[in-house]
């Protein structure tokens, strides 16, 4: 590595970064020996790790700590687009002291919130907006991400029917969030479809970080897990910007920026909150 990069490696200080480790799952096993040897610091990253690394030969328990990366939340987004830290601190102070936010700051933050609903928190989409200040370019980037998701779904299983079910479930998320019954209805895909038969397909979408399931509970008493009803749930996209992109056939981005009232903001706002809580 040192010869290739022409950079000297310093014991205990050099960080060696392995990216896209899902393409070589054995790295997860080998890293144990590398850590034991002790010369360098190692970081591993990749995509779809929740599903791609389930069958690795030996999990290096005790040799690594795991960090989950999520799409940017609203605070991270406004920092990325250039809002000074002192402005964010002023908003936080008003919140904690229960005092009104300066009117000008309030107006600008609301405009940025509308922008966040459109751009979302996917790093590539945010960077595209920063570089171009063009929503159409952002939508193109988001569509590319969604298309990559669909390609990953196509790799899921040899069973073509399972691939089609997952693809259809993913496409149905936007309309299901608008449904009056407030939960995902499997029969909209197929009259004979049951959660028990296809639970693993929903779990795959969750483990692949493409969707966020939120389960109903019989009563709002802690711990919620004890009264969880796994067959009654809502399914959110993993990013509000991707959700807006899936809604984009009606020109929702422009309507949101213009503050139009003929937009169903309920599902979009609900999704934004779900995404923030998950992160």
Describe the residue ranges of each PLM region:
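Interdomain motor-coupling "hinge/lid" segment immediately C-terminal to the ATP-binding subdomain
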Residues: 53-178
């Amino acid at each position: 590595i040192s010869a290739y990069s022409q950079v000297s490696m310093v014991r205990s200080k050099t960080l060696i970064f392995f990216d896209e480790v899902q393409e070589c799952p054995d790295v997860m096993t080998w890293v144990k020996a590398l850590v034991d040897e002790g010369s360098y610091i190692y970081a591993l990253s990749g995509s779809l790790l929740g599903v791609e690394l389930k069958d690795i030969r030996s999990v290096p328990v005790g040799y690594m700590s795991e960090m989950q990366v999520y799409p940017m939340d609203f605070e991270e987004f406004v920092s990325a687009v250039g809002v000074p830290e002192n402005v964010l601190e002023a908003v936080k102070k008003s919140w904690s002291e229960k005092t009104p936010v300066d009117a000008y700051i309030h107006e600008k933050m609301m405009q940025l919130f509308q922008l966040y609903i459109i751009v979302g928190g996917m790093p590539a989409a945010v960077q595209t907006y920063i570089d171009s200040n063009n929503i159409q370019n952002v939508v193109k980037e988001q569509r590319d991400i969604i298309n990559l998701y669909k390609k990953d779904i196509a790799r899921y299983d040899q069973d073509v029917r399972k691939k089609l079910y997952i693809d259809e479930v993913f496409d149905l998320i936007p309309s299901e969030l608008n449904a009056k019954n407030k939960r995902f209805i499997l029969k909209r895909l197929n009259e004979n479809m049951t959660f028990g038969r296809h639970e693993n397909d929903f779990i795959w979408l969750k483990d692949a970080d493409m969707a966020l399931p939120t389960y109903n509970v019989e009563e709002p008493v802690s711990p919620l897990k004890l009264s969880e009803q796994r067959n009654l749930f809502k399914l959110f996209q993993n990013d509000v910007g991707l959700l807006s992109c899936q809604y984009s056939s009606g020109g929702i981005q422009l309507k949101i920026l213009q503050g139009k009232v003929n937009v169903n903001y309920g599902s979009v706002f609900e999704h934004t909150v779900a995404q923030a809580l998950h992160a």
